Amino acid sequence: MNTKHLLLIIPFLTLFCACSDDADDEKYASRPPVFEEIVCQPLNAGETVLRAGQPFVVTARQKSLGRLLNNTTYTWSDSEGQLSHKFTQKVIYDQETQNPTDTVVAPSAGAYKLTMYARYNASGNTSWWSGKHGSNFQSSLTDGGKATYVTGGLFYFGVTLEKTIMVGN
């Protein structure tokens, strides 16, 4: 190997070796937020019951905030596709860590299965979270719903929350 090739290889090896120790360091770890519950609140003052035809706000409450996350996409839906949804679709999570919300109107009384899917692009490494929780992790929400956390390789976390709600007349 001549000197010219050696001079090109040394900087790359130095960079590679310098970064390899950080892969499992918690301070460089991206983490998704951990959710505790999905709460529904009527928009009409004084109301406590969700009613058909009346708007209400659905909030996914975080138990702990995420960390080192950038582009984030939220999608709210219901299993029957009957609810009217209005929500913020994209945020930069580290700048906007508020709880995700959806304003919903149900056309009729009944049970509706709500789903929120969030994709959090990681700006740090995801291996710390995967090493601690696995690449597919489920937990129960305090309100009877469920949360599923999936690590998308080195690049993102996917979080799915599900809960059935009751809407009255």
Residue locations for each model-derived region?
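Sec-dependent bacterial lipoprotein signal peptides
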Residues: M1-C19
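First exposed extracellular module after export/assembly in secreted or surface-exposed proteins
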Residues: S30-N169
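Generic preference for well-ordered secondary structure
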Residues: T3, D22-D24, N44, Y149
